[in-house]
Amino acid sequence: MIQAWHFPALQGAVNELQGSQSRIDALLEQCQESLTKLQSSWHGSGNESYSSVQRRFNQNTEGINHALGDLVQAINHSAETMQQTEAGVMSMFTG
């Protein structure tokens, strides 16, 4: 069985995921700005309900972004480890 690793593709995946993470952050910031303006016009229980939902949304989104960051680190670490292993194996055969 032959295993071949395409390290540039793995790095490309890491870069794509990091880009997604940045886009999520930017969209969240835009969303927050718009919603802050809207929230200022609400009073009473509507404002409280909105605040509760917004906090939950923020927590969930932060969780997703954190998981995405963990995935980026795991893929990056795996690619580095595989590359080091492959270099070590190649050096055994090339002297």
Curated annotation (Swiss-Prot):
Gene3D superfamilies: ESAT-6-like
Alphabetical keyword list: Secreted, Virulence
Location in or out of the cell: Secreted
Entries under SUPFAM superfamilies matching the protein: EsxAB dimer-like
Main localization of the protein described in the UniProt heading: secreted
Keyword Transferase attributed: no
Annotated GO CC locations: extracellular region
Role this protein plays: A secreted protein that might play a role in virulence.
UniProt similarity note: Belongs to the WXG100 family. ESAT-6 subfamily.
Protein name, as recorded: 6 kDa early secretory antigenic target homolog
